[in-house]
Amino acid sequence: MTLRIGTRGSKLATTQAGHMRDRLKHFGRDAELTIVTTPGDVNMSPVERIGVGVFTQALRDALVADEIDVAVHSFKDLPTAPDPRFHLVVPTRADARDALIARDGLTLEELPEGAKVGTSAPRRISQLKALRPDLEILPLRGNIDTRMGKVTSGELDAVVLAFAGLSRVGMQDRATQVFDPDMLMPAPAQGALAIECRVEDEDIITGLNMLMHADTYVTAVAERTVLNRLEAGCTAPVAAHATLDGYAGDTMTLTAGVFALDGSEQLVFSAQGAGERPEELAEQVAAQLIEQGAATLLG
């Protein structure tokens, strides 16, 4: 049986799904890509206006309709509540950080006053405004080539993208600055993929489970649980970053932040706990953010 791997049709999405296809073939499972068009691929409105699941619901619908056997998502795009219809596998995470692609090799600090920077993510907008209130932040949608092309053409001075995406399509050298999470905190589960199949497909589950990376799973789950407990969606100005440390890599450090869209206020809290219990640590961090006033910032 040849597995039908559903993916969005962008260069980045097909590259990501292609890597998963090749890994499955390495484990002896034949697979091919099936392109599924999502509302987010055809509607260039701000993502928060299109609705929840803008990049993922069409793939899940295709799974339910038996049009595909496996769906490959960017984990950060999935709704935060687990869906009992699907089995989830999370492979090894790429670099979670954000990157700046600027003209003339400039860093954020070196951009001239009033420079035009493109991004549509509220999380990035709020943090950029806190770091550089003088910048003109402009909305930006489209694939990686389209976004970076606005810098090449001079329409924008810089854009901010996920470094993982740049790396996956071989464009990591275009980054003029890669932000430390302490400077620009990434989105929950940024850089991680989510692979889903139907829960009743036991043979497919056995094959997909070979791709599971436990450390990526627990750190991404911790970050996304913060988002869930804050009752915020993937487009909210919320960031989170988890790492595993300790002698056996069994201690998790989880930092999360909630930001005012105008950059005027930010709430950040960090805590450590057992890596094997990511939800408990996330609930602790979310509770502290709520106590500090996160609900007010989230509107």
Curated annotation (Swiss-Prot):
PTM-bearing positions, type S-(dipyrrolylmethanemethyl)cysteine: 234
InterPro entries in the cross-refs: HemC, Porphobilin_deaminase_cofac_BS, Porphobilin_deaminase_N, Porphobilinogen_deaminase_C, Porphobilinogen_deaminase_C_sf
Organism whose genome encodes this protein: Corynebacterium efficiens (strain DSM 44549 / YS-314 / AJ 12310 / JCM 11189 / NBRC 100395)
NCBIfam families attached to this UniProt entry: hemC
UniProt keyword annotation of DNA-binding present: no
Highest taxon of source: Bacteria
Quaternary context: Monomer.
The enzyme's E.C. designation: 2.5.1.61
Catalytic reaction(s) noted: 4 porphobilinogen + H2O = hydroxymethylbilane + 4 NH4(+)
Entry's Gene Ontology BP terms: protoporphyrinogen IX biosynthetic process
Protein name from the UniProt record: Porphobilinogen deaminase
GO MF annotation: an example: hydroxymethylbilane synthase activity
Pathway per the UniProt entry: Porphyrin-containing compound metabolism; protoporphyrin-IX biosynthesis; coproporphyrinogen-III from 5-aminolevulinate: step 2/4
One GO cellular component term: cytoplasm
Keyword flag Transferase: yes
Source lineage: Bacteria, Bacillati, Actinomycetota, Actinomycetes, Mycobacteriales
Cited function: Tetrapolymerization of the monopyrrole PBG into the hydroxymethylbilane pre-uroporphyrinogen in several discrete steps.
